[in-house]
Amino acid sequence: MFGWHWLLEWQTPYEFHGHLIEKVFAEEKTPYQHVTLVEFTRFGKGLIIDGKVQSTLYDEHIYHELLVHPLLLSLPKPPKNVLILGGGEGATLREVLKYKSVEKAVMVDIDEKVIEFAKKYLYEWHQGAFEDKRTSLIITDGLKFINETKDKYDAIILDLTDPIKDSTSYMLYTKEFYEKLRGILNQGGGIVTQATSPSFSLEVYVTIYNTIKEVFKEASASYTYMASFDGLWGFVYGGVRPDLLSEDEVNSRIRERISGQLRFYDDYSHKISFSLPKNIKSEFKKITKVSTEKDPIYVPA
């Protein structure tokens, strides 16, 4: 399938980000979602799910490094067992496996087709992580897995699609779900979730923070600019406080715990990412909503 067309990615009901597509590598409507792998004119190779850009070759490393490393470096002990929900491209798994201490990384994704596409087309993302002997890949619903697992983990990473109404993942942003995660964490463990965009869904970003803080008591929020997402992108951490790590602590723990190169994350980017601007911090005082199964939060688009 060659040629070109435009992807109009709706970020709110009244604005979109237009992406020129040079080539479509693969496209399929699975039982769970519409998956497309393309070559963007500006951002290179990219994954689209249900009309939303999930990651691109241009800046996926920024997203995945900030998702993974503040959590794993802030754990009191180097992690041994890590659980990933989502993250079908394999890049979150790639970053987790950089930790010398990791003995087992369990990755759970609902859609086998995304994994199949990633293995075939997205080597730059996973870089062989699916074949690592420490990797355990499970194809099932994340909520079902959490309800049934008997194992406990040092860290849980939620690399999920946005909480869109009637999607496969919106119930994975609720208080009840986070309580289940707390129950399968080892002592001293923590979680992180992608938390949508402070640019386009600030109320959702803050509500995810409120919900995690309600369950874990300890919580912190970070953000970064993602050009391929056309705005700021947020992350929320629970059970640990990566925002309290000093620059020296970040540097020393990178040296001690990580084997492999980081392209974005370091002591300086850590500090900047947790330095929320005044206008965003003020919303944390105004918005008090907590997402529950009876009243879940959704992104506006």
UniProtKB/Swiss-Prot annotation:
Binding-site residues, spermidine: 64, 89
Primary role: Catalyzes the irreversible transfer of a propylamine group from the amino donor S-adenosylmethioninamine (decarboxy-AdoMet) to putrescine (1,4-diaminobutane) to yield spermidine.
Residue ranges that the Swiss-Prot or TrEMBL entry lists as coiled coil: none
Binding site for S-methyl-5'-thioadenosine: 33, 109, 141-142
Keyword Transferase among UniProt keywords: yes
InterPro entries: PABS, PABS_CS, SAM-dependent_MTases_sf, Spermi_synthase, Spermidine_synt_N, Spermidine_synt_N_sf
Keywords carried by this UniProt record: Cytoplasm, Polyamine biosynthesis, Spermidine biosynthesis, Transferase
GO biological process annotation, one example: spermidine biosynthetic process
Oligomeric form and interacting partners: Homodimer or homotetramer.
Occurrences of domain PABS (ranges): 4-240
Chief location bin: cytoplasm
Family: Belongs to the spermidine/spermine synthase family.
Active site residues per record: 159 (proton acceptor)
Compartments it resides in: Cytoplasm
CDD domains recorded: AdoMet_MTases
Gene Ontology MF term list: spermidine synthase activity; thermospermine synthase activity
Entry GO terms, CC: cytoplasm
EC number: 2.5.1.16
Keyword Cytoplasm: yes
Pfam families, A to Z: Spermine_synt_N, Spermine_synth
UniProt signal peptide: none
Protein name: Polyamine aminopropyltransferase
Pathway: Amine and polyamine biosynthesis; spermidine biosynthesis; spermidine from putrescine: step 1/1
Reaction(s) catalysed (UniProt annotation): S-adenosyl 3-(methylsulfanyl)propylamine + putrescine = S-methyl-5'-thioadenosine + spermidine + H(+)
Originating gene: speE
